[in-house]
Amino acid sequence: MLDINYIEQNLDEVIQILNKRNQQDYSEDLKYAVEKNLKRKQILVKSEALKSRKNQLSKEIGILIKDKKNEQADKAKAEVVSLNEQIIKLDEELRIVNDQILEKLSYIPNLSHKDIYFGKSDEDNVEIRKTKHNPLLTHSTPHWEIATKLGLVDFEKGVKLSGSRFLIYTGLGSKLVRAIADILLKRHEKHGYKEIFCPLIVNKSAMLGTGQLPKFSEDMYQVGEQYLIPTSEVPLTNLHANEILTYDMLPLKYTSFTQCFRQEAGSAGRDTKGMIRLHQFNKVELVKITHPDQSMNELESLVKDAEDVLNMFDLPYRVVELCSGDIGFSSAKTYDLEVWFPEQNKYREISSCSNCTDFQARNIQTRFKDKDGKIKLVHTLNGSGVAIDRLIATILENYWDGEKLVLPTILKPYFDNKEFLK
């Protein structure tokens, strides 16, 4: 979440920046939070004054008793009892006000970086670079038909077992998922990421920490008081919650291959066929915990690491910078990698790389001690490296020649050096 003290000191600027996000007006929410923060400070001043008086009286009582001034000691004791009651009352008022501030701030997004483009929707995103359109062969067969024809995926059994937007990888399809995950993890390890095998269920505090809750609760799968992860960004970012790191530990770089779970609320009627939008999907995630001064440089290298994956599979793609109206809730700056789908004749997102600055770190209290011994918040970054189901889908469409799937060179060792699948 945002720093309430920064909001208070820069209210007009914060309102101006935030109101560029989806053209939404956050001014009333921000003013409410500032008003409650002023009340919080007033309560603290009163409480500290009462505690100071209580401490003074406690010392005096000991002296009065020692001097056998019992009547005065009794009066002082009575005042201490009264002070305790007032302090308890103020503590409860403080708790309520703190909850009100946190509740309001939890729905307010991060401040977008000053250099990002202004826009209203994904149509206003800016293309940064792209590779040449050079698919192996041209055709117009959708990936789900290819997957079914080759026996890689059983969509009907997925629906039978779990409902819409679920699928089953079978035989070589299952092997393909494992092969790609292995390729990606090895590549990211080469780039300095530490592999983590993390839980698929996390506590509510972890989801609050990364900003999935409370705003996106309808998109989450809940298991009792816990949640299935929508991305391994959640457990990876929370690895150092409530810790103080040293500056020489930074940057920390983590990668993880997991299943991810999303309700896809609001996606009715979109991508109902195929492997693009699933309730359970496979993804390799990249997370960085960095020094604030280096986070923008680390974002650029994060994008390069994700691009490297697409280059390994020789797939046509482009990099776009998200505009102010399309950027994610926790992000200050985001690049999307979009891969080419010949059958759809358009680019589709396969990776989103974001710098969340100190927005998540403030929630989870991940800090570091700098060279001068000062305690500061880290910056957190995350990106898909990449979404495996979408990667398989685009491989199917770009490497299908109408009769067989020509294997990308990097996959051949996993399939006994075969040239194709049919």
UniProtKB/Swiss-Prot annotation:
Its EC number is 6.1.1.11. It is an enzyme of class 6 (ligase). L-serine binds at residues 231-233, 285, 384. It comes from the Bacteria. It holds the Pfam family Seryl_tRNA_N. It is found in: Cytoplasm. One of its GO terms (biological process) is selenocysteine biosynthetic process. Keywords: Aminoacyl-tRNA synthetase, ATP-binding, Cytoplasm, Ligase, Nucleotide-binding, Protein biosynthesis. ATP binds at residues 262-264, 349-352. InterPro entries: aa-tRNA-synt_IIb (IPR002314), aa-tRNA-synth_II (IPR006195), aa-tRNA-synth_II/BPL/LPL (IPR045864), Ser-tRNA-ligase_type_1 (IPR002317), Ser-tRNA-synth_1_N (IPR015866), SerRS_1_N_sf (IPR042103), SerRS_core (IPR033729), tRNA-bd_arm (IPR010978). The keyword Aminoacyl-tRNA synthetase applies. It catalyses: tRNA(Ser) + L-serine + ATP = L-seryl-tRNA(Ser) + AMP + diphosphate + H(+); tRNA(Sec) + L-serine + ATP = L-seryl-tRNA(Sec) + AMP + diphosphate + H(+). The keyword Mitochondrion does not apply. Pathway: Aminoacyl-tRNA biosynthesis; selenocysteinyl-tRNA(Sec) biosynthesis; L-seryl-tRNA(Sec) from L-serine and tRNA(Sec): step 1/1. GO terms for molecular function: ATP binding; serine-tRNA ligase activity. GO terms for cellular component: cytoplasm. HAMAP family: Ser_tRNA_synth_type1. Belongs to the class-II aminoacyl-tRNA synthetase family. Type-1 seryl-tRNA synthetase subfamily. Consists of two distinct domains, a catalytic core and a N-terminal extension that is involved in tRNA binding. Catalyzes the attachment of serine to tRNA(Ser). Is also able to aminoacylate tRNA(Sec) with serine, to form the misacylated tRNA L-seryl-tRNA(Sec), which will be further converted into selenocysteinyl-tRNA(Sec). Homodimer. The tRNA molecule binds across the dimer. This is Serine--tRNA ligase. The lineage of its organism: Bacteria, Bacillati, Mycoplasmatota, Mollicutes, Mycoplasmataceae.
